[in-house]
Amino acid sequence: MSGGTFFSRVAGHLHLRKAGITMSQRIVVALGGNALGNNLTEQYHAVRETAKVIVDLIADGNQVVIAHGNGPQVGMIQKAMAELTRINPEKYVPCPLPVCVAMSQGYIGYDLQRALDEALRDRGIAKPVSTVLTQVEVDPEDPAFQHPTKPIGSFMTQQEAEALAAQGCAVMEDAGRGYRKVVASPQPKAIVELAAVRALTEAGQVVVACGGGGIPVCRAENRRLQGAEAVIDKDFAAELLAESLDADLLIILTAVEKVAIRFRQPGETWLSELTPEEAEVYIAAGEFGAGSMLPKVEAAVRFARSAPGRAALITELQKARAGIAGETGTRIREA
């Protein structure tokens, strides 16, 4: 049905649809850590551009929850903390990776929260913004702990990567852009602070949660939580967050406008619509790079299948609003 106005109930929410466009959706937006810049100054400016786009979505009547990556940031934090330990090992003990993730959640959330608050005020929208320090439970037996694949930190030359590998660190090439350190990236199982995130969302706040994929934690035998040496992929964490909040749309923002097959190769083709089944064919064919587009497509497929009427959109930041309107981006949903 097109050209008219009608109501539908999707994922527990009542929406007004007009000309095929769903209005007033609950949306989880996943921001890439690479889009936040390589240092504090770059991040300060980057989050302000990001906030403008997100506030556009809020101004359209959507309820928005934000998750974000931290790949470059958590690597820089870990490197800085390791340097302090090297300089003075008696004073500065090694900093565990989950603590580094928590640090990244704090300072990225701080910048996002300020930028969103300013952008909302500029538009005359009265909405509180909250950042929730979020733990995400993983399985200690997840095979990912034996096969690190998650890139963190800045890009390196091949020579720098070989030197780091000689120190016992795992490194890999990242989508033809250089080499990066990689760490374990287990699948998220449960969001520990979900009740808090849901309460704030239902109260009408703009919530930043699951930063950097969430602080990875495992349940010990006594059922207490303990940190895990890993970084959870933010796309999978955002997908779990979207499912858990009964969201209608998962938007995964990346550096390209659409998903492509044969990316940067002869015959490169950009895709506008995919069913989960079509996406899985391309996944099986190795069309998407591990650590870059692959987890985005896998997360999108998972969300599209999680309940009737749900969809995922993969596009770049400045195209998010147009993507919601169906004008661009790659939308993954059941036929």
Question: What is the predicted role of each segment?
Answer:
Residues 24-335:
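C-terminal catalytic "cap/lid" subdomain
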Residues 1-3, 10-13:
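N-terminal amphipathic/hydrophobic targeting modules at extreme N-termini
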